[in-house]
């Protein structure tokens, strides 16, 4: 689909190609009422061509990209008047809050944003019940991305600073949505999945999160950059417990299609149906996973491969191509730093993640003898990489389509001086 390298910008010409079939489109075709709240970040395009309402969502309330992709030095992140930390991106329009294709505010009042998203979620679920329809809600909160923000009820309450306050509000939002599901009497009919997209941005230090015992963070193919928690809740269907089966966000679409009885598009997908794992009827069909860097190419292919408990790194490099993207700087491990060069490893770095999730002990070096099992695992990982790279076809890069400043969303079209004139700020509510 060409969603590489890096990420889309407010003025990007590219976006998620419309010929790609989304999960929302699959479920909408089966009668689901679909809605999305939060961060989109899959492109805007001319007249909003790539926005959620053109990708299978009946309703959308959110910011079309990351909330740091706009000037934020004059914005309030914590009430009553604590400004956002840092200046974010300059020389572009303030971040817009969209309701479907219309600008609700530019910029929005960030301390009140999560509450608006929760209200949107409640309304979607209530309307679906009133229409006797199933619903699909994609809730992509901005928490705990930099710059952190939170509402009045959470500011200064966590004891963990801005990051903790942001996380506390996210926790409350999830709780409010779950309460709404229960109030509608839908707990036994609703599958809830909670997960995240990448590891901590350790360059932000206390404002970026912590990867704990995992190595490095966002922007790397080490576990600190790619391993995320995942929770699934469905009373009467999913028994409480913990699984160590291998899973990926790529598996969500085939899994939800199977559970909802909907048909998948006739294309090759990288995901697997994980319903046997969720329902306790079998093991994960996913036996391996492949990790690309942020700036992939067809020559090197995937940087790392996992099969079962073993993971091999064939190449390592921090994300350094764009300015300010040294996401894992400030850690003591030099392999995480922006100054870390692209390194081809021959033999590859090999780790047993069941015993060493921190990727500290390379099984192919040191004083201990390399066992036959380890050698077999290494050969298997090399074979998997060769087969995967040979089969992969890179689509045309959407990011390489470049940028057009006129595509930036402005609540006052053709105003001057552009882009600072694009201001339709949301008023601060009383008492906040």
Kindly label every feature range from the protein language model:
Residues 252, 307, 312, 317-320, ...:
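Long, internal low-complexity/basic segments
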Residues 58-59, 63-71, 81-82, 200-221, ...:
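C-terminal cap/loop subdomain of S1 sulfatases and analogous C-terminal strand-loop tails that border
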């Amino acid at each position: 689909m060409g969603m590489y390298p890096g990420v889309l910008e407010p003025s990007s010409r590219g976006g998620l190609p419309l010929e790609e079939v989304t999960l929302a489109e699959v479920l909408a075709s089966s009668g689901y009422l679909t809605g999305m709240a939060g961060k989109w970040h899959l492109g805007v395009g001319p007249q909003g061509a790539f926005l959620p309402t053109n990708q299978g969502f009946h309703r959308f309330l959110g910011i079309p990209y990351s909330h740091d992709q706009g000037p934020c030095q004059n914005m309030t992140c914590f009430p009553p008047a604590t400004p956002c930390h840092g200046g974010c991106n300059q020389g572009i329009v303030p971040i817009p809050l969209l309701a479907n294709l219309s600008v609700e505010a530019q910029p929005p009042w960030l301390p009140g944003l999560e509450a608006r998203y929760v209200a949107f979620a409640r309304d979607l679920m209530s309307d679906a019940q009133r229409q006797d329809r199933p619903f699909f809600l994609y809730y992509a909160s901005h928490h705990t991305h930099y710059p952190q923000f939170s509402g009045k009820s959470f500011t200064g309450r966590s004891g963990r600073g801005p990051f903790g306050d942001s996380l506390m509000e996210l926790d409350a939002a999830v709780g409010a949505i779950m309460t709404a599901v229960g109030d509608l009497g839908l707990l036994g009919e609703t599958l809830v999945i909670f997960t995240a997209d990448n590891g901590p941005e350790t360059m932000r230090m206390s404002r970026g999160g912590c990867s704990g015992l995992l190595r490095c963070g966002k922007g790397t193919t080490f576990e600190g950059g790619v391993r995320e928690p995942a929770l699934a809740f469905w009373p009467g269907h999913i028994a409480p417990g913990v699984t160590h089966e291998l899973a990926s966000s790529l598996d969500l679409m085939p899994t939800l299609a199977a559970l909802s009885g909907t048909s998948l598009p006739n294309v090759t997908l990288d995901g697997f149906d994980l319903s046997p794992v969720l329902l306790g009827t079998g093991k994960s069909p996913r036996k391996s996973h492949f990790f690309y860097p942020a700036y992939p190419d067809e020559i090197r292919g995937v940087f790392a491969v996992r099969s079962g408990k073993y993971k091999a790194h064939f190449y390592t490099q921090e994300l350094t191509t764009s300015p300010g993207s040294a996401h894992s700087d400030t850690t003591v491990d030099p392999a995480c730093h922006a100054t870390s060069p692209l390194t081809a490893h021959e033999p590859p770095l090999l780790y047993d993640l069941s015993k060493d999730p921190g990727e500290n002990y390379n099984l192919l070096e040191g004083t201990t003898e390399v066992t036959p099992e380890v050698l077999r695992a290494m050969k298997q990982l090399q074979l998997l990489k060769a087969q995967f790279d040979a089969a992969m076809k890179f689509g045309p890069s959407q990011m390489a389509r470049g940028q057009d400043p006129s595509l930036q969303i402005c609540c006052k079209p053709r105003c001057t001086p552009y882009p600072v004139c694009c201001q339709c700020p949301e008023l601060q509510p009383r008492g906040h």
